Amino acid sequence: RKLETADVMRGEETELMGLNVDITDSLVLLPGSHSKCITVSSDSKIVDFHTYLTGEMTHAISKDTILSKTVNMKCEPDRKYLKIGYEYCAKKGINETLFKTRILDMIFKTDGNQSYGFFMGGLLYGEINRIISFPQRRIVVAGKKELKYPTVFLLKEYSEKEIICVDDASADNAPTMGLLKIYSYVGS
């Protein structure tokens, strides 16, 4: 076994089946507590996938560190600061970027949306940078809206790939629709 090819999928395949958009020959991103990046072939088969811990990191760092007073996850991330956080992380790394989130609040008096944008830009840097490196030209993004929209924005800003954002209702209903699809296959 090799660490770089070992991974687990526990339910995301059901969510994938329930999406109401064409996912053939695409990367499908399902941001959530465990964000999945799934490669789907031209004949609709899962051929590869990667898991990222961005959702849990976002929650843990924003709730259980000195950033808990700075990062409000109920805010809307400021797009300008998403880019600033992303670019800062590219130059200085995740640890310094996270601490600078606090500095922005303390010294520069950024508002909640700006602080949250910088924070999310930094946290998403590694995941976005990895996704951009894949050869697929088409990326479909569903999943939890709190991570979906910053992910879509940064992908559109920093890649030349076609980005399709699944609407919230379809993304939210995808697990149920996937179960119904599986049931219809098994029941036939």
Residue ranges and their predicted role:
Residues 2-28, 36-92:
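Glycine-rich phosphate-binding loop plus the immediately following alpha-helix
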Residues 10-14, 52, 56, 93, ...:
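Conserved active-site and cofactor/substrate-binding residues in soluble primary-metabolism enzymes
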Residues 30-36, 144-149:
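Gly/Ser/Thr-rich loops at beta-strand to alpha-helix junctions
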Residues 46-52, 158-168:
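Short hydrophobic/aromatic-enriched beta-strand-loop microsegments
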Residues 87-130:
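Adenine-nucleotide phosphate-binding core of ATP-dependent small-molecule kinases
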Residues 132-138, 161:
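Short, surface-exposed connector motifs at secondary-structure boundaries
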Residues 137-154, 172:
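Glycine-rich phosphate-binding loops at beta-strand->alpha-helix junctions
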Residues 165-188:
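Glycine-rich phosphate-binding/hydrolytic loop that grips phosphoryl groups
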